[in-house]
Amino acid sequence: MKEIKGIFKANDLAKYINYKYLNMENKIVKEISPLKLQKSLYFCFAYWGGFIYSGEKNKSELTSSFNKYLFDDRIEAWVYGPVVPNVYRSNEYLQECNPDEMFKGNEYVREFIDGILDDVLKVSDFNLVEVSHQDKCWKNNFNPDSLTHNNEIDKDEIIREYAREI
């Protein structure tokens, strides 16, 4: 069995994203779309990893105790941007989420993720797609001629790209 090196499983983080969306005020659509869920997962992973990686490079005490991988699940370059396939193929994110239990001992991680989600969940699905299509890690791995569109994106490549933005 493969050792999980992420803080969470992607499906658990997806449950939390869905929980946050369902508890948002003034949302236009009642349920989170698969596109918004996928882009939320991606941007949470990318910004968290970039933040921790840049802290490691600067020898920050704050970030040294955190894992740079929010989750260890595979991320692929699909037509509408980066996708976590095992989340896409399951409906686990619709299950109940207990945020207090999930983030026990990881309150700082929760605050960080909430900051990302407060912005990302307000943006339209296709604006999120547009933003993700600007990322070099997606551009370098997406093959429009492939019938499967499932090239894996290296997680460290994502993290390094976002570390430059921080």
Residue ranges and their predicted role:
Residues 1-166:
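Domain-edge interaction signal
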